[in-house]
Structure formats: C-alpha cells, structure tokens
From Swiss-Prot:
Gene: pyrF
Organism phylogeny: Bacteria, Thermotogati, Deinococcota, Deinococci, Deinococcales
Family in the record: Belongs to the OMP decarboxylase family. Type 2 subfamily.
Protein name per UniProt: Orotidine 5'-phosphate decarboxylase
Keyword Ribonucleoprotein in annotation: no
Pathway(s): Pyrimidine metabolism; UMP biosynthesis via de novo pathway; UMP from orotate: step 2/2
Length: 272
C-alpha cells in the first residue's frame, strides 16, 4: 500500500534524521537564461535531497516562466519522486465552488500534481472541502494557512483568527480517526518567525503536520522551533528556500552544505 504524504514525510524524518523542507524558488533574475535556471534548480534538488524530508516548489516562480515553467515543474516533481522526496507545492490556492474543485483536481491529482498543496482558507471553511477530499482520495495532504511568516500577517490573522482556523484544522483531523503517532491529511502553515506561538498551535492541532516557513533568509532560527514538534522530533517541517538554493549565488555545493547545516541545526535544537 502506497504511504500517504504524512506517512512518507514522517518515515523520512525518522529514517533520514531530517525535519528540513527544502524550498525551490527558481527566480529568473538570478540566471542568464531559462536553461541555466532549469539545470541549477534540478542540481540543487539533487544535492539537497539527502538532507530533506520533502521539497517545496514555490509555484509562483514556475508560473512566471510560462510553459517552460510548467515543464520544469513536471521535471522537478518526477526527479523528487525518483529521489524519494515527497513534493509539497506552495501555491496558497483558495476559491469557492467549482473553482476550488478545479484547483484541487489540478494540483493534487493532475499532470502537474504534487503530493501536498498549501491552501488559503480566508474565503471560508467550506471552500476547503474540495481540497480535503482530493488530498484524502490521492493519499496527499493540504497545509492550510494559519499564521504566516510575513510581518504584516497581523493585519488579518490577529485577534483570534489564526486560533479559529487551527480549531477547524483539528476538527478535520479528528474525522480521520488516526492512531497514536499518525498525522492527518490536513496540516497547517505556521511561520517559524513566530516562535512564541508554536507550542500553542502544536497543542491546538495535535494531529496536524505543521509547515514552518521562514528558516534562514526570513530570520527564523532552528533553536527556537522546538515548540512545534512532538517528542522524537516528529510533526513539523521547517522550510528554507533562499537560504539553501542561493546560499552562495548559484553554487550547488554551497546549497548542499547549507541543507546539511540546517538539518544538523534542527536536530541539535531538538536533541535528536
């Protein structure tokens, strides 16, 4: 039986001793042409894979390239799976009715599908339904925005809004009747830049995998993230993109070293 996204990530976390999610942000301005961008992105993926629990392509940078970007995304997904890496697409999709269903079908079950997708809940909880259904049907996962890593998130996510979303995520997880140590198909995005809130959200969503963006370039430190994890270092993924892919320009060796260093920093902070 094919493992679910949550099972695959947890297995890799334990077997490879890594809680690192490597983000891929292929920014055209960093390269002389699309061919160089393509090769460097695939090289960084391969170099960092031994130290990653999953890979997170940022869809915006692939979409900005047009058709070559979608072709590259297919290559990235295929290469990641060959390397044994689950693929978490960072698209922050969200809409109503048939549009939400189309997003879910395309990104969780279509030609360019990943194993998981970030989802925006701010049109209402009912809009999550197509994404939840698609994730469950395909053995995938969604990661719902709860408290994002950017400083101005407080404009909309303060005053109890994030906590209300967290409670809904926990409810959706409870529907799956999971056993001890298992994680649901509905996870949460909680910025690593909010270390003081991590333990609260961990307690509110005990069965949710937490995606923690902001490690590295956005200023979050591995030593501050322990509150997001369960005993043994499971239940969360700390994400770094620029800090790995562009650790020293386009130097693939530097990307490898950065991924290794971040993996070790996370393990050291968690004592695992």
């Amino acid at each position: 039986m094919t493992p679910t996204f949550a099972q695959a990530v947890t297995e890799r976390t334990l077997s490879r001793r890594t809680r690192l999610c490597v983000g891929l942000d292929p920014r055209l301005g960093e390269y002389r042409d699309v061919a160089q961008l393509r090769q460097n992105t695939l090289d960084v993926l391969e170099a960092s894979a031994p130290y990653a629990a999953c890979v997170k392509p940022q869809l915006a940078f692939f979409e900005a390239l047009g058709l070559p970007g979608f072709t590259l995304l297919e290559e990235v997904c295929a290469a990641a799976r060959t390397l044994g890496l689950p693929v978490l697409l960072d698209g922050k999709r969200g809409d109503i009715g048939t549009t939400a269903a189309a997003y879910a079908q395309g990104w969780l079950g279509g030609t360019h599908a990943g194993d998981a997708l970030t989802v925006n809940p701010f049109l209402g909880f009912q809009t999550l339904t197509p994404f939840v259904q698609a994730a469950r049907e395909n053995g995938g996962a969604i990661f719902v925005l709860v408290k994002t890593s950017n400083p101005d998130q407080q404009d909309l996510q303060g005053q109890g809004v994030s906590e209300r979303i967290a409670v809904e995520i926990a409810r959706l997880g409870d529907e799956e009747g999971l056993g001890d140590g298992d994680y649901a198909s509905v996870g949460a995005v909680v910025g690593a830049t909010h270390p003081g809130d991590l333990a609260t959200f961990r307690a509110l969503m005990p069965k949710a995998l937490l995606l923690l963006p902001g490690l590295g370039a956005q200023g979050a430190q591995a030593r501050d993230l322990a509150g997001a994890f369960h005993a043994g270092g499971t239940g969360a993924l700390a994400s770094a993109s620029r800090a790995v892919q562009y650790a020293r320009g386009l130097d693939v060796g530097a990307a490898r070293e950065a991924a290794l260093a971040l993996r070790d920093e996370l393990n050291g902070a968690l004592g695992v």
